[in-house]
């Protein structure tokens, strides 16, 4: 996809010129010039779009097309309005099968041109993204391949930053959408190694069952033992500032989750290929950071396995010893994500991080609580909470803080081991899952992102979203600016 900037938009620059207009202001100078050339055509078309979101097309204007979209009154043109207009424009361009467009939308009052450009590119790229296509007997879908923006105040630097972000998001989506027979733990490790070959600032180590066993990662091995696919622990570093204290992202990499012996319902089990979306987001963020050349030290740790059923699969009631030395009674084999994360979070201690954020499609309970709008997050660190909230607001990648009170820890008590891996009932499922993880994070500042509701869209049009890559990149940009 090509994105660019222009100071002098014209009808002939692309297949379609998109012009956003205010109901209470005159046309901008460049639009007035085009209107004069076309003998008042634009002003006539504007009379046919009285309400915000109204659109009107004019085809075959010097062999090109013109789309007018009403943006309402200037003072009422908000970030939310921008999001709606960009969505309507993108869907219209794709429906009309345009390959290129020049988009001229008014500036927001409250935000910088750099922020507005970034949001427009992220949204357009999100809507034009197409699933990996394994079909053999039909023509490939039409693609919108080039969008040029006219946005006074936007710079080439902000354009390149936006392009880096969408590249990271796309990489995350491609990995998450990959079928589980291709995207195995081994494949995830290969993708991490590939990043280290693409960028000099990235190094990577991928560890297999022997190394995992030597480190005492009994929880990760327990989850993996029911599958013929060997587990992987991926340790990937972005060296943007080797002298700074590292930030660590820990990703859940369950490349397929049948639930194990606590088997999931058949309905929508195919979507359990998305249970590695946390891992995909970690790799997407690291790729974007390398493109952005952020001056930070970032480490990604991914615990990857398949959770399947076999004669050797872990059983309900089994007790395992984690890397931390704590023992866990596994009462539910479908609560496997927290098991692999427990060992990965303990592994993170060796780097003495500034803070750690784990990203995981962890619980169905968070979907019941928040749906697919906001990612649920938990932390006991108020400074980290403020940083996450700020990054979420700026990136428009929404979050909602859930409680992490000590009282919830009682739900994890076991008569046989240090803890059970899931509560005996369904109450507060997302919170007790985070409480479980908190027992492995006492040596550093930590936050948990439960992306089970936001990592993908379910149903016939199932598709990975790439979240929370925009949120995490924005957070890391603030970290970079503070050092």
Swiss-Prot record:
Keywords: Aminopeptidase, Cytoplasm, Hydrolase, Manganese, Metal-binding, Protease. This is Probable cytosol aminopeptidase. The keyword Manganese applies. Binds 2 manganese ions per subunit. One of its GO terms (molecular function) is manganese ion binding. It is found in: Cytoplasm. It comes from Legionella pneumophila (strain Corby). Belongs to the peptidase M17 family. It holds the Pfam family Peptidase_M17. Its main location: cytoplasm. It catalyses: Release of an N-terminal amino acid, Xaa-|-Yaa-, in which Xaa is preferably Leu, but may be other amino acids including Pro although not Arg or Lys, and Yaa may be Pro. Amino acid amides and methyl esters are also readily hydrolyzed, but rates on arylamides are exceedingly low; Release of an N-terminal amino acid, preferentially leucine, but not glutamic or aspartic acids. It is an enzyme of class 3 (hydrolase). PROSITE patterns: CYTOSOL_AP (PS00631). Disulfide bonds: none annotated. It comes from the Bacteria.
């Amino acid at each position: 996809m090509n994105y660019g900037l222009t100071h002098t938009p014209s009808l002939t620059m692309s297949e379609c010129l998109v012009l956003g207009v205010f109901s209470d202001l005159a046309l901008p100078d460049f639009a007035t010039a085009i209107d004069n050339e076309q003998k008042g055509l634009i002003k006539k078309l504007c009379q046919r779009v009285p309400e915000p979101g109204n659109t009107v097309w004019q085809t075959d204007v010097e062999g090109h097309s013109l789309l007018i979209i009403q943006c309402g009154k200037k003072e009422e043109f908000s970030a939310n309005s921008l999001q709606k207009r960009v969505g309507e424009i993108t869907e219209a361009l794709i429906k009309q099968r345009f390959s290129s467009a020049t988009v001229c939308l008014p500036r927001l009052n409250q935000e910088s041109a750099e922020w507005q450009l970034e949001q427009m590119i992220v949204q357009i790229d999100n809507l034009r993204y197409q699933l990996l296509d394994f079909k053999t007997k039909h023509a490939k879908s039409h693609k919108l391949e080039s969008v040029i923006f006219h946005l006074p105040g936007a710079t080439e630097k902000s354009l390149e930053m936006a392009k880096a972000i969408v590249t990271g998001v796309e990489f995350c989506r491609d990995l998450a959408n990959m079928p589980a027979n291709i995207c195995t733990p081994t494949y995830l490790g290969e993708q991490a190694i590939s990043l280290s070959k693409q960028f000099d600032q990235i190094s990577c180590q991928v560890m297999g069952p022997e190394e995992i066993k030597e480190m005492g990662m009994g929880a990760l091995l327990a989850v993996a033992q029911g599958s013929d696919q060997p587990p992987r622990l991926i340790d990937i570093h972005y060296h943007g500032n080797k002298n700074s204290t590292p930030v660590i992202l820990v990703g859940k990499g369950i490349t397929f989750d049948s639930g194990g012996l606590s088997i999931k319902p058949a309905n929508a089990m195919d979507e359990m290929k998305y249970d590695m979306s946390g891992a995909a987001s970690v790799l997407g963020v690291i790729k974007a950071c390398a493109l952005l050349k952020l001056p930070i030290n970032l480490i990604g740790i991914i615990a990857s396995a398949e959770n399947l059923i076999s004669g050797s699969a872990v059983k309900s009631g089994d007790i395992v010893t984690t890397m931390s030395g704590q023992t866990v009674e596994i009462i539910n084999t479908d609560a496997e994500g927290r098991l692999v994360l427990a060992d990965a979070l303990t592994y993170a201690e060796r780097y003495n991080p500034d803070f750690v954020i784990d990203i995981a499609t962890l619980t169905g309970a968070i979907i019941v609580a928040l749906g697919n709008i906001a990612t649920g997050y938990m932390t006991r660190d108020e400074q980290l909470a403020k940083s996450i909230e700020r990054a979420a607001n700026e990136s428009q990648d929404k979050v909602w803080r859930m409680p992490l009170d000590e009282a919830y820890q009682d739900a994890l008590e076991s008569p046989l081991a240090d803890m059970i891996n899931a509560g005996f009932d369904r109450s507060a499922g997302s919170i007790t899952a985070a409480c479980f993880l908190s027992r492995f994070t006492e040596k550093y500042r930590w936050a948990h992102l439960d992306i089970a509701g936001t990592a993908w869209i379910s149903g016939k049009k199932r598709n990975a979203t790439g979240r929370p890559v925009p949120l995490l990149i924005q957070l890391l940009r603030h970290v970079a600016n503070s050092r």
